Amino acid sequence: MMRQKVRIPSILSALFFALCGLMSLYLTYKTAGNLLDSDASSELVLARLLADTNQILSRDWFYSTELRVLNTQLIYMPLFKIFSDWKLVRFFGALLLQAILVLSYYFLSRQAGFSRNVFFLTGGLLLLPASTPYARIVLLHSYYVPH
């Protein structure tokens, strides 16, 4: 007996993607001002220093754990030029980095020949805060997006 493929309507996969995006947006908004993590906060401190000195690289910064030259500060630094509120910078920076993550995955999925339906289903999973470590490391702190 042959198994039939289950076809999910495109509207359902797009709806799933939108729902996951909204969940990530809500989580990012609720936690943007409450992340007390030295590594994540040091990225914002560096970005603020770069914004205040109008530089992309700084000679006055000593990295605590690793050398991060082209990283999240390239997103956060221009946001400090717009907003003075650190919570807003973290919120919009995380959203921009999540958008970059999804757009880069969209490019990969199209190059791999995936349908848009598959992209919406799997791209939604990228934005889904399925566990605390994934939500903190990837979605909120955006550690692996620039890599």
Q: What kind of region is each of these model predictions?
A:
Residues 1-24, 114-120:
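Start-transfer (signal-anchor) and selected internal transmembrane alpha helices
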Residues 22-41, 134-136:
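Helix-to-loop transition at the C-terminal end of transmembrane segments
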Residues 30-38, 52-77, 87-88:
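Membrane-proximal lumenal/periplasmic loop motifs of glycosylation machinery
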Residues 36, 69, 116-147:
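Membrane-interface micro-motifs in multi-pass membrane enzymes
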Residues 44-49:
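Extracytosolic (periplasmic/ER-lumenal) interhelical loops and adjacent juxtamembrane/interface segments
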Residues 67-74, 92-100, 142-147:
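Membrane-embedded alpha-helical segments of multi-pass membrane proteins
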Residues 82-93, 117-121:
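Membrane-interface starts of transmembrane alpha-helices
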Residues 92-117:
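Transmembrane-helix motifs of polytopic, lipid-linked glycan transferases
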